[in-house]
């Protein structure tokens, strides 16, 4: 009867297993002492397997009953049960041989177990150990054991169970002194007495007696072999471990040589030689290739071949095994002594419950043999167990010579080396893509076939890989088993934890070969490299647009399908992207974890925080290759590049208008639908965004929340405040290389450079006029449309430009905040102050490229250049006169309307132009700021000074095209040209006489005034004389 069947019969007697015709019931037929029942129940409770039951309900019930039989809560107190659990754990942590010795004496408490351990330690400190060996043929045994350097195989794990059941080994044991092979064997009686008195002898005897196998195995099934190259790579510690493992296997296989009992009959007290010989022949065939045994060999072992692979080792283990492995072909049939038959039977009966334990080491086909002491995991090969143990110890013996990375298995190292060599031997036949591992190829091929064999039971989603399904299931369960020891953050995947830990270490192992930028993640490097290569492998089937990342493609496709899969549970708002939902949810939770140390501003996302820090550092890593403009964010760069390529991907479905930015389309669509429009309660004006409404409302309530700490000035908008602060810091980081002028913004520098290059990329579609900045074009278009969006609250006057409104409002408030340091004059506009300062410095930065003439103002240069080009774009609708500037047109139109908006406070005189009022006021104040360098004569206006200086220089720039006559002043040329044209636009109302000049008209009008005055005077004198009469 095999040990497995014996154990099964014992369990069946106990009532804890079912027979073929039995139904399950709790039996009470177990025979034996209470101690045996307790130990057996303990073993059955620990070693019950799920496949031994019919289902989970039965497994749970059996475990409960076995635990009750083991702990006996009806008879023991809580303290006693706790002591049993502690005793079990104490025995489990003892070394194997000591645990066997302690369990041999059945300690009832922890104190008894401690006493037994201390007793054994004292005995082990004595002289050399004498090992009792069960003798079958003393001559053959003497040949093997007495060989120089003979060592016995290690005890099988789990042998302490048999030692518990067989406390008294057979008496026919012969003690051999391992240190003295020539020592004579004592008599059996003396040997038995020695074993009873010396616990060491009992312990060592049990190591041999209790190594009972469950099933016979061949040595090849548990051996681990290395090639000569692999063996050369092993270190001393690894080779020592290999010797220990192989010796352990040798001990395990050697124990299988003992004769097995038949299933249906007990072992006879005197087995015949023929029975033993037949049994021995079958056993020897199974042991073919094993190490030399104490018993008989039928075949020559292959241990010598294995030893030859180890080379010339100097280790003592090598010498020992080589000597033991000199096998002899002993054909003698050995039989145990007849007087031992009864003891063999008792031993077989006592080993009934030992087979359950030996399952943990050597099992039947399909079972796992080797158990890890750390996590109790089982393995069917000891090489797998060795590799598994390295996970607990952290040992990584296989090192990469390129990067120093360590691996537990050599196969993992070989795969890793392909990363350095670039070798990808596995190629896809569909698309030609190559892979370094076959598993990667198999997973990739499922993309072509569409196969998703791993399905989620919760939502039905399919996955190409099993690992993907496991990770997905953690979303449903919320499980995040991987925790960071630094900050306590948890992750659903170990890879995410490794990547996160690089943040703490500052490690960036992936570096770009072109720009040397480093990244934490390899996928980030791959995506970054597509910026250099311009690769966009993911294409939309609807519109043909390509993307660098598959996530961008998925998000883009949702625009076509109008899918918004991510919904906020708080407010019901839906989003295309999950990250947008996460950012939105922080609005409800008010979770803002990223704080700026410089300004104290807090952000809910790390990306926004990084973008904000670039405002302080002025870092702009994203540069346009077309115009050189730099941006703080890549999204701004993408939007900017659409200006160059003319791309406007966002089209309104209502009116067909296209936009560069999606947010511009969203704001525009609100005007069609009326959805989410923000209306001002004071004036009814609507806005597309709440931010614009808030800024607008501050105009009504006068709120200016942004205050300058330097001068105390307040502002409605933050951007206006930031621009103002640069006046105090005089921070102008952007300098023009042509003229040296500095600017606070890079955009201002780009616009300024167009003055030097003459570039005007923004053209008006109505009149074809081009501008250097888009803002100027927008302002120009208002002239054609007649739009004047800026209205004065005091007088209701409207303006095209906001700065014009601000300047106009200063007329009402009489605010002039810009003061000249040289003469103390104040101005409403900063631009006027800058232009005024050029009077003191004599600077004329705007020069004509045709004649070289310089101008203080850019507008004067533009007007001057029209003289050369003959361009006159502004026509008067009344008299069809064409003028070179809109300002001149406005001044000219006042002649027809008679409008004179500028009035002198001193004398009440009105003027059509502000400059004429300023010159007139100098007559009252006596101010003459313009002085001639030659004669020191002063003038009230600069025009008079310029005309006077031409007397000294003799310059007469204005020539007549008809008679070639030249003049110092333009007005003189104008008057002269009327002689050729006979134009007399000035007509006297009294005499209806026409004049070519207004001055002549004024003289004629004075003549009529004098004549009228004389007539009245004469009339009054006549009336007086009549009254006297």
Curated annotation (Swiss-Prot):
One of its GO terms (cellular component) is nucleus. Transmembrane segments: none annotated. It holds the Pfam family zf-C2H2. It is found in: Nucleus. Keywords: DNA-binding, Metal-binding, Nucleus, Repeat, Transcription, Transcription regulation, Zinc, Zinc-finger. Residues 42-124 form the SCAN box domain. It comes from the Eukaryota. Residues 262-290 are annotated as: Disordered. GO terms for biological process: regulation of transcription by RNA polymerase II. GO terms for molecular function: DNA binding; zinc ion binding. InterPro entries: C2H2-ZF_domain, KRAB, KRAB_dom_sf, SCAN_dom, SCAN_sf, Znf_C2H2_sf, Znf_C2H2_type. Residues 217-289 form the KRAB domain. Its main location: nucleus. A zinc finger (C2H2-type) spans 370-392, 398-420, 426-448, 454-476, 482-504, 510-532, 538-560, 566-588, 594-616, 622-644, 650-672, 678-700, 706-728, 734-756, 762-784, 790-812, 818-840, 846-868, 874-896, 902-924, 930-952, 958-980. May be involved in transcriptional regulation. Belongs to the krueppel C2H2-type zinc-finger protein family. PANTHER family: FINGER PUTATIVE TRANSCRIPTION FACTOR FAMILY-RELATED, ZINC FINGER PROTEIN 502. This is Zinc finger protein 197. It comes from Homo sapiens (Human).
């Amino acid at each position: 009867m095999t040990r497995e069947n014996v154990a099964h019969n014992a369990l069946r007697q106990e009532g804890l297993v079912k027979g073929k015709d039995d139904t399950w019931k709790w039996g009470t037929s177990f025979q034996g002492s209470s101690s045996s029942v307790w130990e057996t129940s303990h073993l059955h409770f620990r070693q019950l397997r799920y496949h031994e039951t019919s289902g989970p309900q039965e497994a749970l019930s059996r475990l409960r009953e076995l635990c009750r039989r083991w702990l006996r809560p009806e008879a023991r107190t809580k303290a006693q049960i706790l002591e049993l659990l502690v005793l079990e754990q104490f025995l489990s942590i003892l070394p194997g041989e000591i645990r066997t010795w302690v369990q041999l004496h059945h300690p009832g408490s922890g104190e008894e177990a401690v006493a037994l351990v201390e007793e054994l330690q004292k005995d082990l400190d004595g002289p050399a150990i004498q090992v009792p060996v069960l003798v079958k043929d003393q001559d053959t045994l003497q040949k093997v054991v007495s060989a120089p350097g003979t060592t016995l195989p290690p005890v099988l794990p789990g042998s302490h169970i048999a030692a518990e059941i067989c406390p008294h080994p057979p008496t026919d044991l012969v003690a051999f002194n391992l240190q003295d092979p020539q020592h004579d064997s004592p008599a059996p009686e003396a040997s038995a007495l020695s074993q009873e008195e010396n616990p060491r002898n009992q312990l060592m005897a049990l190591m041999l007696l209790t190594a009972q196998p469950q099933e016979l195995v061949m040595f090849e099934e548990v051996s681990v072999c290395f090639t000569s190259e692999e063996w050369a790579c092993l270190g001393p510690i690894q080779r020592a471990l290999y010797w220990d493992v192989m010796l352990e296997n040798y001990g395990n296989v050697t124990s299988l040589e003992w004769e097995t009992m038949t299933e249906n009959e007990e072992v006879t007290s005197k087995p015949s030689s023929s029975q033993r010989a037949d049994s021995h022949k079958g056993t020897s065939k199974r042991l073919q290739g094993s190490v030399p045994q104490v018993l008989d060999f039928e075949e020559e072992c292959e241990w010598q071949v294995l030893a030859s692979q180890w080379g010339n080792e100097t280790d003592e283990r090598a010498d020992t095994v080589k000597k033991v492995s000199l096998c002899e072909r002993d054909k003698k049939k050995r039989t145990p002594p007849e007087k031992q038959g009864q003891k063999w039977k008792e031993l077989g009966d006592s080993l009934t419950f030992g087979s359950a334990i030996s399952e943990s080491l050597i099992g039947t086909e399909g079972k796992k043999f080797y158990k890890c002491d750390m996590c109790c995991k089982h393995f069917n090969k000891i090489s797998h167990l060795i590799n598994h143990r390295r996970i607990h110890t952290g040992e990584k013996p296989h090192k990469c010579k390129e990067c120093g990375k360590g691996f537990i298995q050599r196969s993992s190292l070989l795969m890793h080396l392909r990363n350095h060599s670039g070798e990808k031997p596995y190629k896809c036949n569909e698309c030609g893509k190559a892979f370094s591992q076959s598993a990667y190829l198999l997973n990739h091929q499922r993309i072509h076939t569409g196969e998703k064999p791993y399905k989620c039971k919760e939502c039905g989603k399919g996955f190409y890989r099993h690992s993907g399904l496991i990770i997905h299931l953690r979303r449903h369960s919320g499980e995040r088993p991987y925790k960071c020891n630094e900050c306590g953050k948890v992750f659903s995947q170990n890879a995410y934890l490794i990547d996160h830990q690089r943040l703490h270490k500052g490690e960036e192992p992936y570096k770009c070969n072109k720009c040397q930028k480093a990244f934490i993640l390899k996928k980030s490097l791959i995506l970054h490299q597509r910026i250099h290569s311009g690769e966009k492998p993911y294409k939309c089937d609807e519109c043909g647009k390509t993307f660098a990342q598959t996530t961008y493609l998925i998000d883009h496709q949702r625009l076509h399908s109008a899918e918004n899969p991510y919904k906020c549970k708080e407010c019901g708002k839906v989003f295309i992207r999950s990250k947008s939902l996460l950012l939105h949810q922080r609005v409800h939770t008010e979770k803002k974890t990223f704080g700026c140390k410089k300004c104290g501003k807090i952000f809910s996302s790390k990306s926004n925080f990084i973008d904000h820090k670039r405002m302080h550092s002025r870092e702009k890593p994203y540069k346009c290759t077309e115009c050189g403009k730099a941006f703080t964010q890549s999204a701004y760069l993408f939007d900017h590049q659409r200006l160059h390529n003319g791309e406007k991907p966002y089209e309104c479905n209502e009116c067909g208008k296209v936009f560069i930015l999606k947010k511009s389309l969203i704001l525009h669509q609100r005007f069609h639908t009326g959805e989410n429009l923000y209306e001002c309660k004071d004036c009814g004006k609507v806005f597309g965004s709440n931010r614009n409404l808030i800024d607008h409302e501050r105009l009504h309530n006068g709120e200016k929340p942004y205050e300058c700490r330097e001068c105390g000035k307040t502002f409605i908008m933050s951007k206006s405040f930031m621009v103002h602060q640069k006046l105090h810091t005089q921070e102008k980081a952007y300098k023009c290389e042509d003229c040296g002028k500095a600017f606070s913004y890079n955009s201002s520098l780009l616009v300024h450079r167009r003055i030097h290059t003459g570039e005007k990329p923004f053209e008006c579609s109505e009149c074809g006029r081009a501008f250097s900045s888009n803002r100027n074009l927008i302002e120009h278009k208002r002239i054609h449309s007649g739009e004047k969006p800026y209205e004065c609250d005091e007088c209701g006057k409207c303006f095209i430009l906001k700065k014009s409104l601000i300047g106009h409002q200063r007329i009402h408030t009489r605010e002039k905040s810009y003061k000249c340091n040289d003469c103390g004059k104040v101005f409403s506009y900063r631009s006027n102050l800058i232009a005024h300062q050029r009077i003191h410095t004599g600077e004329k930065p705007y020069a004509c490229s045709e004649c070289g003439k310089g101008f203080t103002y850019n507008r004067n240069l533009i007007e001057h250049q029209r003289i050369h080009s003959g361009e006159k774009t502004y026509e008067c609708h009344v008299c069809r006169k064409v003028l070179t500037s809109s300002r001149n047109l406005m001044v000219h139109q006042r002649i027809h309307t008679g409008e004179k908006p500028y009035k002198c406070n001193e004398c009440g005189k009105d003027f059509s132009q502000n400059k004429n009022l300023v010159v007139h006021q100098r007559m009252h104040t006596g101010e003459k700021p313009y002085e001639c360098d030659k004669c020191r004569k002063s003038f009230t206006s600069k025009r008079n000074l310029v005309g006077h200086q031409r007397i000294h220089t003799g310059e007469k720039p204005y020539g007549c095209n008809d008679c070639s006559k030249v003049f110092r002043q333009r007005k003189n040329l104008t008057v002269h040209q009327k002689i050729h044209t006979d134009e007399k636009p000035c007509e006297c109302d009294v005499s209806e006489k026409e004049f070519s000049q207004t001055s002549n008209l004024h003289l004629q009008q004075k003549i009529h005034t004098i004549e009228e005055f004389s007539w009245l005077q004469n009339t009054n004198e006549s009336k007086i004389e009549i009254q006297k009469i």
